[in-house]
A protein has these predicted regions:
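Extended hydrophobic blocks
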Residues: 1-160, 261-316
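A structural signal for short, hydrophobic/glycine-enriched beta-strand patches
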Residues: 155-307
Length: 316
């Protein structure tokens, strides 16, 4: 009975908090708890009924799941290693691109150490260390699952076509002055919304291109984005540059200042890549913006590394 109440409580709490504000990782944590207790409820209900067929089926399913766990973990580690090698090949040998490879090798090392501790039963210290590491990995795995749920659910935004401003978040430039494909996808996503809003409502939104100038860049990201929008046929009178920000939180804060200076009551929307959408939403909330986001598609091979980096940025 308690399990049912906990499942219902966490599910109801998730619905209420999501309705208030979807831009919180705590929503994902609560949903994970709701799913966990829901599964426990199903298992408990099955065994409590005493139906031999149902109990046999459920017992078989649970046994198979337990037996598959090691293969599942090794499979994830292998996929991360393969993805890490692909990232290094396509994106260059940078530490940030090595994250999937490092984590994949770390998981395999943990598995080997775990089996080593089982075989070497005479070393209690090794056993304690392994248990501690496994508990730590379990904790962060729970948080990562909650983050993935939050990120996935936040993709389903259906903004109204009444926006006054479209904020496009910057990223690094190619050759110091050119818009890379990643940034172009953000701009194209904003243009698509701009065109659709104008077609439906006859209302033109103003673009705010937000991004400062990096050490290896000859112009600001905002200036490069402005040039890209003009090339795509956007009237320069509907483009505002915010060229001082150096991170996502500043993107939001400085863009808000630009919008506040123009009007006091407005609707705004930000555009970024789908993997970055949830964290950008968190920073929008911290900056005092009611803005929700729209996400541009990202190459599939890039997603594992990008999501790991987003998770680290949120939790650290």
């Amino acid at each position: 009975m308690v399990i049912y109440l906990l499942a219902g409580f966490f599910l109801l709490l998730f619905i209420v908090l999501s309705f208030i504000d979807r831009r919180r990782i705590s929503n994902g944590i609560i949903l994970t708890m709701a799913l966990f207790f829901s599964v426990l409820s199903v298992v408990y209900a099955t065994f409590s009924k005493g139906n031999e067929l149902l109990v046999s089926v459920m017992g078989t399913v649970l046994l198979l799941l337990v037996l598959l766990i090691p293969f599942f973990v090794v499979g994830i580690a292998t996929m991360l290693i393969v993805n890490g090698r692909l990232m290094l090949k396509r994106e260059g040998r940078k530490l940030a691109n090595m994250l999937p490879l490092i984590i994949g090798l770390g998981i395999l090392a943990l598995i080997i150490t775990w089996f080593g501790s089982i075989l070497k039963t005479g070393s209690p210290i090794l056993g304690i260390v392994v248990v501690f590491i496994v508990a730590l990995v379990g904790y962060f795995s729970f948080l990562f699952l909650s983050f993935l749920l939050s990120t996935f659910l936040y993709q389903f935004n259906f903004p109204r076509y009444n926006q006054d401003f479209l904020i496009v978040l910057g990223s690094g430039l190619i050759g110091g002055d050119r818009v890379p494909p990643l940034l172009a996808s953000r701009l194209n996503r904003a243009i698509k919304f701009y065109d659709k809003q104008y077609a439906k409502k006859g209302k033109r939104a103003t673009f705010i291109v937000s991004g400062g100038q990096g050490a290896n860049e000859t112009i600001s990201e905002a200036e490069a984005m402005r040039g890209y929008l003009i090339e795509q046929g956007i009237d320069e009178n509907f483009i505002i540059m915010e060229d001082q920000s150096v991170n996502t939180l500043q993107n939001m804060k400085f863009s808000k200042a630009k919008m506040d200076a123009i009007m006091s009551n407005y609707n705004s929307l930000f555009s970024t890549n789908n993997f970055h959408l949830f964290r950008a939403g968190i920073y929008a909330r911290k900056a005092g913006l009611k803005s929700q986001g729209i996400g541009a598609k990202t190459a599939l091979y890039y997603m594992p590394n990008a999501l790991i980096r987003e998770f680290i940025a949120i939790t650290v």
